[in-house]
């Protein structure tokens, strides 16, 4: 989806906050006459990260997102989730390393989501929720199933749950 570059947008009223009671970090700002809010938290027992972007005007969220990973990873789309898999080697410490898998579910309130291997496009959404889970084989050889199940279970809940 075509979007404006973030460098072209003027941002005012930028504010960061942290609620220790609710364990939620948030950022709010105004751009183009629209008030936006981003909220972030890690949930237990779901063991996922949740990021939510909302706007005070309908159909105000249009954007493209991609991954810029520090490690070599294979990217794919599976079950409407962006999936990245790979292995991290530690050559200084001998052979071995850990295999990893990460999944990102993108849930848009209204609007359209276009998911491709290169990233995700969101068009005219009222709100967007990202659910992120990353697992390694360090503790469990079944890390891929745990990762997929974690995102799937969390995505089945409403944001308020």
Where are these regions (language model features)?
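Aromatic-residue-lined binding/catalytic grooves and analogous aromatic/hydrophobic interfacial grooves
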Residues: 4-161
């Amino acid at each position: 989806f075509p979007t404006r570059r973030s460098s072209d947008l003027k941002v005012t009223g930028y504010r960061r906050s942290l609620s220790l009671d609710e364990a939620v970090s948030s950022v709010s700002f105004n751009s183009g006459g629209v008030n936006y809010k981003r909220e972030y938290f890690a949930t237990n027992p779901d063991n996922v990260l949740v990021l939510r972007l909302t706007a005070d005007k309908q159909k105000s969220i249009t954007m493209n997102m991609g991954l810029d990973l520090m490690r070599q990873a294979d990217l794919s789309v599976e079950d409407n989730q962006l999936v990245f898999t790979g292995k991290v080697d530690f050559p200084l410490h001998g052979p071995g390393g850990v295999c990893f898998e990460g999944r990102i579910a993108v849930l848009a309130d209204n609007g359209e989501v276009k998911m491709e291997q290169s990233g995700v496009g969101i068009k005219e959404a009222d709100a967007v929720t990202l659910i992120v889970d990353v697992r390694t084989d360090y503790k469990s050889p079944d890390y891929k199933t745990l990762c997929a199940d974690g995102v799937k279970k969390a995505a089945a809940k409403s944001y308020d749950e």
